Amino acid sequence: MAEHVLAAVRTAPGRTELREFPMPDIPDDGALLKVEVAGICGTDVKMYGKPPFADPVIMGHENVGVIARAGRTFTERKGLAEGDRVFVEHYVGCYRCEWCHRGEYRHCEATDWRTNPDARRYGYTSANHPYHLWGGFAQYLYLPWNAVTHRVPDGVSAELAGLVTPLSNGIEWALVTAGVGYASTVLIQGPGQQGLSQVVACKQAGASLIIVTGTTRDAARLSLARELGADHVIDVTQ
């Protein structure tokens, strides 16, 4: 394995530099992920133009890759082995607080960079913190014991697995928050990635009528919405 890792580092608003970091020595309960896919989220675009803090950051929080090196304790706890392809959630909770015990680790203070300057969250944590590799826009990603990983099923490509985050948002917003279910009538305003993900979620949930709205410039996305299961699409500019 190489001695250094190349990463794209946000160093200022709208500015990226390629930097080398030392390949970290992982503890027995840690691992290194060789990054295959790192998605670009709408949040990334916003944070790139207006960073919330000045520290250098390796962005990228929608990450899929292969376990390149793993400590024994890590593999035993996670049920993973070197060579396994995994999707990594961007929240790194403490697993001790009330939120973590409820399974809502995204609300854990240990991963909330807005209130905790020492928080760990992929794509948001300063590259100055130990192990440095806290974002997917790099060759490798560091996985501590409390990283949330999901094995990618055999036959699913890294590119396809990279859609897990937006699709998960669609499932949560449509099914959990809005309560969409069998025979529901649904209006989705906007055929962006999140809106299209909700089309998939609503269709699978058994919605009887799915309507998606957009503008003339969304013509291709509205067409895709139909392919994904929308019953009607409406161009609101016509």
Regions found by a protein language model. Name each.
Residues 11, 22-23, 54-60, 128-133, ...:
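Short Gly/Pro-enriched turn/cap motifs at secondary-structure boundaries
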Residues 169, 194, 217:
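Hydrophobic/small residue at the entry helix of a nucleotide-binding pocket
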Residues 12-14, 27:
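Residue-level recognition of beta-strand termini and adjacent short loop/turns
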Residues 24-38, 51-101, 105-106, 153-155:
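Glycine-rich beta-strand-centered segment in the early N-terminal region that forms part
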Residues 5, 84, 183-184, 208:
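Nucleotide donor/acceptor-binding cores
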